Amino acid sequence: MSESVQEAKSALSKIRNIGITAHIDAGKTTTTERILYYTGVSHKIGEVHEGNTTTDYMAQERERGITITSAAVTCEWNDHRINIIDTPGHIDFNIEVNRSLRVLDGAIFVIEGVAGVQPQSETNWRLADRYNVPRIIFINKLDRTGADFYYAFSTLKEKLDIVAVPLQLPIGAEENFIGVVDLVEMRAIVWEGGELGAKFHYEEIPDDLKEKAAEARQTLLDTALAMDDAAMEEYFEKGDVDVAILKKCIKKGAISGEFRPVMCGTAFKNKGVQPLLDAVIDYLPAPDEVEGIRIAPPEGEEVDEDFLPIVPVDPDGKFAGLAFKIISDKYGTLTFVRVYRGVLNSGDTILNTTKGHKERVGRMFQMHADKRQEVKSVGAGDIAAFVGLKDTVTGDTLADAADPVVLERMQFPVPVIDISVEPKTKDAVEKMTLALQKLTAEDPSLHLKTDQETGQTILSGMGELHLDIIVDRLRREYGVDANIGAPQVAYRETITKPHVETYTHKKQSGGSGQFAEVKIEFAPSEKPDEIIFENKVVGGTVPKEYIPAVEKGIRMQSTTGVLAGFPTVDFKFTLLDGKYHDVDSSALAFEIAAKACFREGMKNAGPVILEPIMDVEITTPNDHVGDVVGDLNRRRGIIQNQETAGSTVMIRAQVPLKEMFGYISHLRSATKGRASFTMQFHHYDPVPRNVAEEIIAKSA
């Protein structure tokens, strides 16, 4: 191994790429701010309620006190570089969590000390499971009235179905919370007043916690040492184990997912953050300590992903990286890239292997939220922002042309709400179009289309807040004032039974005419969210060169369903037979025939309208439960379960999105502002007949 490669591998061991994620208001941005303060990135602690945080740098984020985008921040701790991504908690911005977890090696899950595990934490946890991201849990806000570490801890098993192992226990509760018991070193860590939590000291474990700490330490030893036979043997021989060995076992368990280490504190009151940083270094993996990334299966092929080759993180290989975020600002377009293999220098030309074209990297930056530090090269394990890429979007692979690997693709959620967007002046049409193109390039969960009948520009997103933010950005960042239509449900159409349709397209108007005949079977798809095409033509009744035109015609026509003009989804179409004419047939003729065949065939295949069904979770005081449940029933909701925690009740229901517009105002009014709710897309379901008739009549 060359000296330079050895140096690169050594440097790699000192990198941590982590995300901080949680339910909205659990304190993840506050936790990030404390980390930046203690690591010296910022010299003043920003506060969410004051609108001056480092990672929430967009105007809308500071006004609303929520995180909208994933801000990337680099900091140093104990001779290690930590790249942190602070992600949104609001479900409307789940795309940001998805793409961040996709490129990280570890994560801190911030859990609120009063409520415990909440819906968005569950959603994010499942996403992290999908990408096998090692995790540390930080139970936060233990200074709050009603905070209970042990209750919050119990929700980890109950709602996430995991083996959670505390590495700390709290000292004191609510306003008397002063520190933690460190179960690894078996000592108390107590924070001193003033100096924004920068000063703390170690002392003996308080007498009233010694028994509880001994029990928790035993649980930690039993669980962690099971990861290493030699460590377990040493423990049996000596009755204890060296701290370094115990830490190594905890790290092994955290990376494998056998158990999840749990820390605690209160970021807002500056207690518990430094040990959390130590835990990031001690227990979360360096880039080369995780499996790496799978290559993508060939386009259109079904392959068991367990058999796909893995690209390991390797500084000595040919360059390969994944673009996971695009930002347009006053300086141009920034493309955030996670590097998995090799080294790249500014000015190099690389291949976008997803699209098959070359890109030249102009400059590269390490980001500190909206501030940037230029770097001349990046290597395996790095996260950096590239300037100069012309045609690269989220999810594209960038690689050395000598080894044009395509990395595993990202999956993005389906938008469920539409609004129409029209500029207030004709002069602003082009300006608005360019702005919306930039915004949709940044955000793959945002879709843009033109209504074929009205000519209106339609913007589709994940929720009312999502679209509200986009409209606000149009005005602030791009100077476009627009008239916005009321939010509309993004309905879909599908079919419920198979049907075979034959259609002949014949046109003769002097000279050569047009002729094409197709026989197509339409059937419900066995795979959700997919339109599948199969060609079963034999004997050349439809020449091979015209087959793509048939597929193109059906896919184009499927954007306008036969019932109410909504996109048709979840169906399979099979070309069975057809006829052609030596002179009059053409690709265009077969495309036209396929479109007409779709229009006629779908009418006889049991078409139905689908509506988005949302998972709704409402937290309400006991005395309002009856009113809330009754109202949900009136909204066609189906109650899933109810859980009581003290004087509040958590109600889970599935409710059609159509019935949830404006719900927050109604809920506040009905409960005098004491209830709250979260909502996220769950699935599409056929609408009842009376609702379908209403929708069809409105679209006529």
UniProtKB/Swiss-Prot annotation:
GTP binds at residues 22-29, 86-90, 140-143. GO terms for biological process: ribosome disassembly. CDD domains: EF-G (cd01886), EFG_III (cd16262), EFG_mtEFG1_IV (cd01434), EFG_mtEFG_C (cd03713), EFG_mtEFG_II (cd04088). Keywords: Cytoplasm, Elongation factor, GTP-binding, Nucleotide-binding, Protein biosynthesis. The keyword Cytoplasm applies. One of its GO terms (cellular component) is cytoplasm. One of its GO terms (molecular function) is guanosine tetraphosphate binding. Gene3D superfamilies: 3.30.230.10, 3.30.70.240, Elongation Factor G (Translational Gtpase), domain 3, P-loop containing nucleotide triphosphate hydrolases, Translation factors. It is found in: Cytoplasm. It comes from the Bacteria. Its main location: cytoplasm. PROSITE patterns: G_TR_1, G_TR_2. SMART domains: EFG_C (SM00838), EFG_IV (SM00889). It holds the Pfam family EFG_III. Residues 13-288 form the tr-type G domain. Belongs to the TRAFAC class translation factor GTPase superfamily. Classic translation factor GTPase family. EF-G/EF-2 subfamily. Catalyzes the GTP-dependent ribosomal translocation step during translation elongation. During this step, the ribosome changes from the pre-translocational (PRE) to the post-translocational (POST) state as the newly formed A-site-bound peptidyl-tRNA and P-site-bound deacylated tRNA move to the P and E sites, respectively. Catalyzes the coordinated movement of the two tRNA molecules, the mRNA and conformational changes in the ribosome. This is Elongation factor G. It comes from Gluconobacter oxydans (strain 621H).
